[in-house]
Amino acid sequence: MSKRKIKEEMLQVIAPEIYGPPKKEEQDYKPRKLKRVKKKKKDDDDELDDEVELLHATAPRRRVQWKGRRVKRVLRPGTTVVFTPGERSTRTYKRVYDEVYGDEDLLEQANERLGEFAYGKRHKDMLALPLDEGNPTPSLKPVTLQQVLPALAPSEEKRGLKRESGDLAPTVQLMVPKRQRLEDVLEKMTVEPGLEPEVRVRPIKQVAPGLGVQTVDVQIPTTSSTSIATATEGMETQTSPVASAVADAAVQAVAAAASKTSTEVQTDPWMFRVSAPRRPRGSRKYGAASALLPEYALHPSIAPTPGYRGYTYRPRRRATTRRRTTTGTRRRRRRRQPVLAPISVRRVAREGGRTLVLPTARYHPSIV
């Protein structure tokens, strides 16, 4: 046996490699014991028995009696009310408005503030629902707000009468053309009582089950002072005798119609605008600016357009042929300096004795 094996056997006898549980270290300090301190009872039991017992004693109030916001818990639609012990309830969600508009009692929910209409910090007195987002009259702009009119007269409501139009909620809104100014439309236009308005009834557009929107366009014919003034102005420019007689008759008819309408609708008299005859415009002294094109050279790949300036660029060929030089003696090639056109300049004296040399510029004939 080797010496190493003998040493291992001797060590196994003296200190065997068997590890038992670790020894616990003895604690040098003792745990401190806390004594409970009992409160002394007041010896006022006899006095309390003689007094009146208060059943609903209130706590001492603060200076400011602040109460938090009263929150009414509302169960959101779509949540499944199932009690599973040991599990949390799922997070609530709001429905998509495509699904909300599919309910048949949509208006009742909005009126009673149920379901999706039960949310919000502030209570809104008037609730509006956008039933239609289309614009059947894009050329008009609104002047007044869209007001809801009662379907029944107040006397009929008092008597408790019911009609077929009880479920209707008609709205009225005044609209004018977009291209006209609002001041001209409201101030200068007058309504002719004799003419009947043009009524156009559009088809019913379904919004929700049992709910639809129908647009009725009522076009009211109006007359403005500007149109009459332009009519008389155009009539006064006629020179032939027959046309002038017809024009005088037309002016008298328009004035008579205006006087009739002014007695009923408008109190101010009609104001006719008399303008001077237009003079013919003189001929121009210069041509169009687009005709003044510079002389330019086109790329060889571009074919020139007939009728326009410009030529195809062709590189100039030298008249003399290039001589072949011997390999021993090569001449140095010099670049030609470009031939520049003479530029007319002018000297401008500035403050401080400085003189600037500026080129003279050619201006367009329309620039003074």
Curated annotation (Swiss-Prot):
Cystine crosslinks: none
Maturation and modification: During virion entry, is ubiquitinated at the nuclear pore complex by host MIB1. This dissociates viral genomic DNA from capsid and allows genome delivery into nucleus for infection.
GO biological process terms on file: viral release from host cell
UniProt subcellular location: Virion; Host nucleus, Host nucleolus
Protein name, entry field: Core-capsid bridging protein
Subunit structure: Monomer. Homodimer. Exists in equilibrium between monomers and dimers in solution. Interacts with the histone-like nucleoprotein; this interactions bridge the virus core to the capsid. Interacts with core protein X; this interactions bridge the virus core to the capsid. Interacts with the endosome lysis protein VI; this interactions bridge the virus core to the capsid. Interacts with the peripentonal hexons. Interacts with host NPM1; this interaction might play a role in virus assembly.
Induction (record text): Expressed in the late phase of the viral replicative cycle.
Compositionally biased intervals (Basic and acidic residues): 22-31
Keyword Chaperone found: no
